[in-house]
Amino acid sequence: MNTRHSGNLLIILIVFITTLLLLSAKSDGSLGSTNILLLGAQFLGIIGAVLFSLSFVLSSRARFVEYLFDGLGDAYKVHHITGAIGFIFLINHPFLLVLKAFINGSSTAMYLIPVGPVSYSYGIYAIYFLLTLIVLTLFIKLPYNIWKVTHTFMGASLFFALLHVLNIESDVSRNMVLGLWVEFFLLAGGVAFIYRLFLYKKVTGTYLYKVGHFSAVGEVFNLTLFPEGESIKSSVGQYAFLKVLNNKQVSKEEHPFSIVEINEMGGIVFSVKKIGDYTRTLGNLKSGDKVEIVGPFGIIHKKLDAHPEPVFVAGGIGITPFVATVEEALTSGKKVYLYYSVREPAEALYDERFKELAEKFSNFKYKLWISNTRGKIGAQNIQQDINDLSKKFFFVCGPKPMMDSLKKQLREKGVKSDDIYMEDFTLR
């Protein structure tokens, strides 16, 4: 079974068990006598706290998360979903309590203003930190370094949520199993937050490099970095997070880029397209600039090992994780198909390299696809070379619309979802 399904199923199982534990906590007959608004508030608060905590674990970049979700890309997608649902649930937790108090003619202040019991105040602080973060993220355009600092508010929110759970008189405090279950996930979220903030670079591997060769070809920067000390050890198709340290003209943001190769001189090669504000500032790099590299990440090499006839489809700069991967697959005797789609021939940076491989290896089927003259590449074009697409494993990397469209077409041609691996880097 595809490991990303394991991760998704685990999330669903955790929510299911949490719901059962909450219901079992009311097995004494209190369920029937519990106000429906109070029951809803309890459900939203407990499930929301668990999902919110899990979102920290999913964004920690821990190795087990990468393998459990078939790569950090899928883990981050689930992180965004669990975080969003958890946030909505947590925000509506006090809303239902306020509504209940209003209907009963009771005071609503204790749910909105931290002036009542300290256990309630902890919960209010947690919500305030969450709301502040949402306002800063959605309505105020902040520089990246400031935006990143504001995300410590999430840690503060989690901390106060834990204090709220530990001190509030509720089913969580009265039922030991439910209490330990919820507290475990809150603590796990806290540990993940601390790990991501202080430990992950040390555990994963951090390396100091300097800029050696730098050139621009059209909209693409070709960058070769050389180690200042220990060098990174990576497998084909992997990527790393780069951060420029000492050039004030380049943002100190940390971004993931595919490792094209590690050359014979020990230099690590990247090809980066000028897409957003950050990548455009890379044009200010100069020889000798210091660059921090964290990694490597990525599991393409593990997927490659399991499939004897891989099909690679790359769009534009999406070719970068496949350059060394294709050569590795050919050297190991696999029959390899590569479709390299670019708008015009000048964008095909690695065309000559692949042509040389096609001359060298009879087990290599290579096709350069010029979309400006032939239109976008689709499953029907690939099917002209491969009759039964359903028996192949596909690696796809490129612009998201291209990947989504191709996946849909391949699925319509009978290719299983588990046999399509899409590499993307939406990791913020």
Task: Indicate residue ranges for each PLM-predicted region.
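Membrane-helix interface/capping segments
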Residues: V57-L72
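Canonical alpha-helical transmembrane segment with a positive-inside/aromatic-interface signature
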Residues: V177-F184, I194-A216
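Ferredoxin-reductase
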Residues: V203-K290, P308, V342-E344, K355, ...
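Alpha-helical transmembrane segments with an aromatic anchor "belt"
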Residues: L68-T82
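Membrane-interface interhelical loops and short amphipathic "cap" helices
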Residues: S27-L39, N104-Y111
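Functionally critical transmembrane alpha-helices in membrane proteins and complexes, commonly lining
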Residues: I36, G40-F56
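FNR/FR-type flavoprotein reductase catalytic core
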Residues: G7-I11, V15, G45, A49-F52, ...
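Alpha-helical transmembrane segments of multi-pass membrane proteins
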Residues: I14-G29, F56-L58, H93-L96
